[in-house]
Swiss-Prot record:
Pathway: Cofactor biosynthesis; pyrroloquinoline quinone biosynthesis. Belongs to the PqqB family. May be involved in the transport of PQQ or its precursor to the periplasm. Keywords: PQQ biosynthesis, Transport. GO terms for biological process: pyrroloquinoline quinone biosynthetic process. InterPro entries: Metallo-B-lactamas, PQQ_synth_PqqB, RibonucZ/Hydroxyglut_hydro. This is Coenzyme PQQ synthesis protein B. PANTHER family: COENZYME PQQ SYNTHESIS PROTEIN B, HYDROLASE C777.06C-RELATED-RELATED. NCBIfam families: PQQ_syn_pqqB. It comes from the Bacteria.
Amino acid sequence: MHIYILGSAAGGGFPQWNCNCPNCHGVRTGTINAKVRTQSSIAISENGVDWILLNASPDIRQQLFDFKAAQPARKLRDTGITNVILMDSQLDHTTGLLTLREGCPMNVWCTEMVYQDLTTGFPVFNMLKHWNGGLQYHQIDPKQAFKINGFENLEFLPLIIQSAAPPYSPHRHDPHEGDNIALIIKDHKTQKQLFYAPGLGKIDDQIMQIMQDSDCVMIDGTLWTDDEMQQTGVGKKTGREMGHLYISGEGGSLSYLNQLSTPKKVLIHINNTNPILNENSAQFAELKANGVEVAFDGMQIEL
């Protein structure tokens, strides 16, 4: 399985266009050791030619420009992207579908709850239905594994997780099964497994066992502390209120990751306020010392 990190930041990217927090100001002026990052999305493939997007970020045009393998150039209009899987209906994971309209008809896999959001509050399916066949909806049963034509060795097993529907959703404060999923992706040829959960509000015993059984875990790294948005003065909500588990301290994701013998542990969906973006920070050093990597745009993993 080929895994390519198209974007590794949370909503707004890094630096966020209107933000002057220490991180955003520092990367903009070159005064901190940090990489510019686009909004989170990854691509996976079993042959290096045909690819599946996991989430479609607002930055998808630039991401695909930087990802040369996505353009095999076999004909006048071409792409290696044949399918999109949505983990949720968050704007930073779905607005890229509008940019992909020239590639319609496009196969889009999501749960019924996500489809409801994307036909009402943010009706992107409706908007594009007259655009050369539009978005072709494939329903994900959040309790059942599925396969995708053309990717015969890959099996996708959804996992219902605790997080939150987007602010525009009518059930933002009324959680439903299928609002958010993680994915266990198994490559039956290499016998390797990826666990992907860019939006993760809680780690329970089931998730711990799945992560232990995986060869690579790539999970939510939005915030270093639960009150980070408040402490930096850019927001009023805690991470948990937004559906994101913080990294540090008791009950943080790092305390769980440190219990795993999983070969590769990666944090993705990193907010612009998070000190781990500064590669000279104590927080970045702590992750490195514990064998946890910080995802960056262009990162490649082979399983």
